[in-house]
Every structure is written in structure tokens, then in C-alpha cells.
Amino acid sequence: MQPEVSDQIFYAFLTGGLCASSTSTTVTSSSDPFATVYEDKALASLRNHKEAERKRRARINSHLNKLRKLLSCNSKTDKSTLLAKVVQRVKELKQQTLEITDETIPSETDEISVLNIEDCSRGDDRRIIFKVSFCCEDRPELLKDLMETLKSLQMETLFADMTTVGGRTRNVLVVAADKEHHGVQSVNFLQNALKSLLERSSKSVMVGHGGGGGEERLKRRRALDHIIMV
């Protein structure tokens, strides 16, 4: 395949074979075989460069099209607008990740949150639904004591999630209570029962460490300063 004339002119110029005048442009062939080999290599290099550039652009366009699909953008969305939307979406995902982390990773302070999230009065379902969340020092009997506490309050566990990191634990539960025995004021009963449970956890840690090593961990503990009631 013969090289394109524009390629010949460009590389002939680089190798000194281009003769230009005000009226015409010609390409001269060198009788030197080494010069001919050099020109062939230069033209081959140019073709390789063009092919590599074509593939690079195709790869970039493919990635941009994938981003358009992910962000539900139409095919005519320009690159600058698309990239701005990508940056905004990444920021939103980062914020969501931080919020999820705050909800699942145990904090350094003892916390209790009791929320009345639903009042079911449809048909035979006459229950009050509470969402319970608390952080405290972990101990072997904690889960058992928690179940006994809920049982004593005549509450049924609908959902439970526990995360333990570095000796601290966060528990999130959704519990249901029968309206015959409970009302909105039951938030106070549940809160006080959990407060007692957390205090037992702290005492257990102190005794378990003989008042020594556990004392350092208890320095992280604060009073129950995050009690939320609705």
C-alpha cells in the first residue's frame, strides 16, 4: 500500500527531501538507500501513531458512554457536563458511605436511641414499633441480657443487627409491643432498661480488668449523653 501524499510530504520535510517554492511543492526521492529506509520507518511510525491515537480515542469514548449510562445521561451530553455530574455523584456516594459508617461502626461513647417509628392499627395488627440503637462495651452476656430485658418488657424482636469493633459494640433492633400493654410512653421504659444494661456492661469490663487495664478503656466512656426520644 502506497503511503499517503501528505505523509510523504511531512516526512520528506523532516529528512530534508522537501523542496518548496512559491508556485509548487515537490517530493524528491533520495538515491541513498539508507535515506529510503529511514523514510519508510518514519512513515510506518506515523501510521502506528495514528492507529494508537485512534484506539485511545475509542477507549475514552467507550468509558464516557458507560458513564452516561450509569448517570442516565443522553448520548448528546458533552464531556464537561458529564464529568461535572460524575464528580457530584462521587461526592454523594462518599457522603452516603460516611453516614452508613456512622450508623454501623460503634462509637467511643455509650449511646442510646429509642424511636417510635410506627403505630400499627390495621386489622388485627395492633402493635407499636420501636427502633432501638445503643453502643457500649462488649461483654459475653450482653446479648443474653438484652433478650431477657426485651422479654421482661413483653416486646418482640423483628430485626437485629450487631457490630463489634475493638471491644465496642453497636446494636440496632426493631421491636414490636402490643398496644394492650404499651403506649408511646413505653419509650421511657425501654430507655431506662437499656441504660441499666449499659451500666452493667461498664461494670463488667471494669471488674474483668481488675480496675487496671479496663480503666483506660473506660476513659473513653461518657455519660449517656445521646438519648433520643420521640
From Swiss-Prot:
Instruction: State the source organism's domain of life.
Output: Eukaryota
Chief location? nucleus
Q: Which InterPro entries does the record cross-reference, listed alphabetically?
A: ACT-like_dom_sf, AIG1-like, bHLH_dom, HLH_DNA-bd_sf
Signal peptide: which range, if any? none
Query: A single GO CC term, please?
Result: nucleus
- Quaternary data: Homodimer.
Would you tell me the protein name for this molecule?
Putative transcription factor bHLH107
Organism per entry: Arabidopsis thaliana
Q: Which gene encodes it?
A: BHLH107
